[in-house]
Amino acid sequence: MTGASLALTAAVVAHAYYLKNQFYPTVVYLTKSSPSMAVLYIQAFVLVFLLGKFMGKVFFGQLRAAEMEHLLERSWYAVTETCLAFTVFRDDFSPRFVALFTLLLFLKCFHWLAEDRVDFMERSPNISWLFHFRILALMLLLGVLDAFFVSHAYHSLVIRGASVQLVFGFEYAILMTVILTVFIKYILHSVDLQSENPWDNKAVYMLYTELFTGFIKVLLYVAFMTIMVKVHTFPLFAIRPMYLAMRQFKKAVTDAIMSRRAIRNMNTLYPDATAEELQAMDNVCIICREEMVTGAKRLPCNHIFHTSCLRSWFQRQQTCPTCRMDVLRASLPTQPQTPTEQQNQHQNQAQQQPTPVIPPQPNFPPGILPPFPPGMFPLWPPMGPFPPVPGAPGGNPPDEANPGSSSGSSPRPGETSNVGSESQPGAALPGFPFPPPFLGMPILPPFGLPPMPMPPAGFTGLTDEELRAMEGHERQNLEARLQCLQNIHTLLDAAMLQINQYLTVLASIGPPQPPISSTSTSTSSAASASTAPTTSNISEPVIPVDTTSTVTNTESSQQSAPPAPVSVETLSGAEGGETTTEEPDNVELRRRRLQKLETGTTDSQ
């Protein structure tokens, strides 16, 4: 690209000189021709790029990948802000204006590279004299250029009034604060490298340096915005750098306050680690990678570090270096227990814990509940008796439930009443008033789940180290245990909810009708249905009490002599004296029922 731009520039200049044949007319032609100026601009940018690479080789040598990445990332934003500045100062747009902005962007790039290279000193163990010479020479050159351009902008504003030099003056003033921060950091890193032991107060000085320079940047941007709004227009290109400066200053203030609080808590709340605690665990500080002998602090999460390392760490962030626990929100640490104390405590708890009293299981009829596999719900308490079903018949004998039949007439001689001897299906099952539903259906296990797996036999074959590795003391282990307990609690709640729904449905369906086993059962059911029409789904007319008594006596006579066939004419003749006084509809209804009972008796025989 360099050769192409050079050849294109030479061709444009030669063409202009060929047309004008003199130097001055050639220069005028090149400045007035837009294509020629575009080619010259491209050539100027190429020359600036070559100059930047040359100065980078001189002051930095080989750039690292992180430095190149930061440079490209910041350059895109700087170019965008420069284009926005061109739109704000479009009346002052000229080759000189473009050259000044190009020079400003060029110097900004070297300020960014100097800042990254000085930060690299903290992570590099070996710093050569050539490195110091390059950094000092670069900082001196950049400082002189910044001061010169600030002075030039000031004199231009004093002599010519408000112009585009106002922007350049504030930009170079901001760059002066950047180079001041870089110089102070360089001094602090150099002092730290000269000392044999790590310098504990370096982080404090760096924090207050960033706080001071950040405050100066915020003041400069606020003053620049105020002056630009009053003199020219709203500086849209300064919004992003002003926001970044304010955010950096706010972060520095917050870090200063939180670090002082964390260091105060470390000095007052956190206990010193004892020699036994250091021997019982890995005594290597993960911050400095050196062994801890004395001067170590134990955090609330029971992690131990050097006091000086913690002080430097808390200047940057207020979390545990190992588990990232917020030390400002943690409670007062508790003394860790030795394995012997933990074993004694577990034994005492096991002795003091009373034996749980298991209440007796309710007497449920077989088949009313599906057979639960053993061990499926080991944590459930024993279930109590089921709630009574509203409207379900109890264990009372039928003569109490139907007083009309007993008071209306007395049994005849020779007849044995079977009403009192009849037994309801639910009366023989204490604790549950009705038989199990769905007698013909196979009973499935609840929810279709297989039985729970049996717990492991024991951990006798594992060593202490393996048990500690399985238990875990880090944050992710505790979170995994809590999540497992929450899952178990959720599954138990869901299972209990489904069981309650099952019991509710079971109680709401009511007792099913028992199967017809004998003539007496069928006759009693028909008599009960005729005396209690409210329990039937079909509305029927009410039959008087005397009629019911007659039917009951007739049924008793039928039960006492089963071989003799029962006919409608016999029963009708026995009741012939009473039918004359009843209505024709009731007589017809009774006749049909007796005919139905006769048919049922014949089928059962």
Swiss-Prot record:
<feature type="compositionally biased region" description="Low complexity">
    <location>
        <begin position="334"/>
        <end position="355"/>
    </location>
</feature>
<dbReference type="Pfam" id="PF13639">
    <property type="entry name" value="zf-RING_2"/>
</dbReference>
<feature type="compositionally biased region" description="Polar residues">
    <location>
        <begin position="546"/>
        <end position="555"/>
    </location>
</feature>
<dbReference type="GO" id="GO:0008270">
    <property type="term" value="F:zinc ion binding"/>
</dbReference>
<protein>
    <recommendedName>
        <fullName>E3 ubiquitin-protein ligase synoviolin A</fullName>
        <ecNumber>2.3.2.27</ecNumber>
    </recommendedName>
</protein>
<keyword id="KW-0256">Endoplasmic reticulum</keyword>
<feature type="region of interest" description="Disordered">
    <location>
        <begin position="513"/>
        <end position="605"/>
    </location>
</feature>
<dbReference type="InterPro" id="IPR001841">
    <property type="entry name" value="Znf_RING"/>
</dbReference>
<feature type="compositionally biased region" description="Low complexity">
    <location>
        <begin position="556"/>
        <end position="579"/>
    </location>
</feature>
<feature type="binding site">
    <location>
        <position position="288"/>
    </location>
    <ligand>
        <name>Zn(2+) 1</name>
    </ligand>
</feature>
<feature type="transmembrane region" description="Helical">
    <location>
        <begin position="36"/>
        <end position="56"/>
    </location>
</feature>
<dbReference type="GO" id="GO:0044322">
    <property type="term" value="C:endoplasmic reticulum quality control compartment"/>
</dbReference>
<dbReference type="GO" id="GO:0005789">
    <property type="term" value="C:endoplasmic reticulum membrane"/>
</dbReference>
<comment type="function">
    <text>E3 ubiquitin-protein ligase which accepts ubiquitin specifically from endoplasmic reticulum-associated UBC7 E2 ligase and transfers it to substrates, promoting their degradation. Component of the endoplasmic reticulum quality control (ERQC) system also called ER-associated degradation (ERAD) involved in ubiquitin-dependent degradation of misfolded endoplasmic reticulum proteins. Also promotes the degradation of normal but naturally short-lived proteins. Protects cells from ER stress-induced apoptosis.</text>
</comment>
<feature type="region of interest" description="Disordered">
    <location>
        <begin position="334"/>
        <end position="433"/>
    </location>
</feature>
<dbReference type="GO" id="GO:0012505">
    <property type="term" value="C:endomembrane system"/>
</dbReference>
<feature type="binding site">
    <location>
        <position position="323"/>
    </location>
    <ligand>
        <name>Zn(2+) 2</name>
    </ligand>
</feature>
<dbReference type="InterPro" id="IPR013083">
    <property type="entry name" value="Znf_RING/FYVE/PHD"/>
</dbReference>
<feature type="topological domain" description="Lumenal">
    <location>
        <begin position="20"/>
        <end position="35"/>
    </location>
</feature>
<feature type="topological domain" description="Lumenal">
    <location>
        <begin position="114"/>
        <end position="129"/>
    </location>
</feature>
<feature type="binding site">
    <location>
        <position position="309"/>
    </location>
    <ligand>
        <name>Zn(2+) 1</name>
    </ligand>
</feature>
<dbReference type="GO" id="GO:0036503">
    <property type="term" value="P:ERAD pathway"/>
</dbReference>
<comment type="similarity">
    <text>Belongs to the HRD1 family.</text>
</comment>
<feature type="coiled-coil region">
    <location>
        <begin position="465"/>
        <end position="496"/>
    </location>
</feature>
<feature type="binding site">
    <location>
        <position position="285"/>
    </location>
    <ligand>
        <name>Zn(2+) 1</name>
    </ligand>
</feature>
<dbReference type="GO" id="GO:0016567">
    <property type="term" value="P:protein ubiquitination"/>
</dbReference>
<feature type="topological domain" description="Cytoplasmic">
    <location>
        <begin position="151"/>
        <end position="163"/>
    </location>
</feature>
<dbReference type="InterPro" id="IPR050731">
    <property type="entry name" value="HRD1_E3_ubiq-ligases"/>
</dbReference>
<feature type="transmembrane region" description="Helical">
    <location>
        <begin position="1"/>
        <end position="19"/>
    </location>
</feature>
<feature type="transmembrane region" description="Helical">
    <location>
        <begin position="164"/>
        <end position="184"/>
    </location>
</feature>
<keyword id="KW-0812">Transmembrane</keyword>
<feature type="transmembrane region" description="Helical">
    <location>
        <begin position="219"/>
        <end position="239"/>
    </location>
</feature>
<keyword id="KW-0833">Ubl conjugation pathway</keyword>
<feature type="binding site">
    <location>
        <position position="320"/>
    </location>
    <ligand>
        <name>Zn(2+) 2</name>
    </ligand>
</feature>
<comment type="subunit">
    <text>Homodimer.</text>
</comment>
<comment type="pathway">
    <text>Protein modification; protein ubiquitination.</text>
</comment>
<feature type="binding site">
    <location>
        <position position="301"/>
    </location>
    <ligand>
        <name>Zn(2+) 2</name>
    </ligand>
</feature>
<feature type="compositionally biased region" description="Pro residues">
    <location>
        <begin position="356"/>
        <end position="391"/>
    </location>
</feature>
<feature type="transmembrane region" description="Helical">
    <location>
        <begin position="93"/>
        <end position="113"/>
    </location>
</feature>
<feature type="compositionally biased region" description="Polar residues">
    <location>
        <begin position="415"/>
        <end position="424"/>
    </location>
</feature>
<feature type="compositionally biased region" description="Low complexity">
    <location>
        <begin position="516"/>
        <end position="539"/>
    </location>
</feature>
<feature type="transmembrane region" description="Helical">
    <location>
        <begin position="130"/>
        <end position="150"/>
    </location>
</feature>
